[in-house]
Amino acid sequence: KRLFKYKIHSFRRSLRLMRKNILKKKFKEGTPIINGWLQIPNSFSAEVMAQQGWDSLTIDMQHGVIDYPNALQMLQAISTTETVPLARVNWNEPGQIMKILDAGCYGIICPMVSNRKEAEKFVQACLYPPKGYRSFGPIRGLIYGGQDYGSHANDEILKLAMIETSEALKNLDEIMSTPNLDGIYIGPADLSLAIGQKPGFDNPKGSKTHTEILNILKHAKKHKLFAGIHNASPEYAQEMINLGFNFVTVGSDQRHMSSEAKSVIEKMKGSKKGQDIKGY
């Protein structure tokens, strides 16, 4: 058996078959995906996070302090593990989407998708023709993904559109019926602002934001899409899983570091001596 497995492994290596996106496998199996969030522009901190066992890690290029050279090194660090590398781009801009995919990113979270046209623009930027208009040049994607990357990338790349604007709430079915869209991702802070509420995470039951979250989830389930959401705490993330979300982000590298440092200071100097946790 060992010899057979070795031969199969050697055969796959010789062919360089494209690395599978295990997030899609988990979705089909009904297994919740626990996603980490990176805002610090450092490959070592990304490697430390990746070693903790997250199913995926998202490099935040929208609100994190991360540019492309940072992101490339962080992708290299994440690839030392089985954690799936994702990125949230700073806007629905094809050039940036294609470039970070070329660097070996296995999925894109796109902010502020408000209608069908914007959803199609986003999805098609992630796909090679004839399904999309992505330009071919996966300079690191070939190294990380495999030599047959071009033949299978359309099937493996994860595409999540963020639902967080008042216009998007009016166009949920149009957005979610976009061909080849894999799922949606809720940004609770911007969603709260869009409906006249204070921005924040872990919105309580009965709040306007929580009601809208349930409505978005219902539509995602109807269209059989990934349903993702950003959370501040593991307890709230578990509540979201119990409701039916299958992709949950819990905090961020910056927030985890702040929280642990605050805890240490409070224990050493007395309660409430640490700074309130900032960021998300």
Give residue spans per PLM region.
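Expand to "…catalyze enediolate/carbanion chemistry for C-C bond making/breaking, isomerization
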Residues: L15-Y280
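Short, Lys/Arg-enriched N-terminal segments with co-localized hydrophobic residues
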Residues: K1-L17
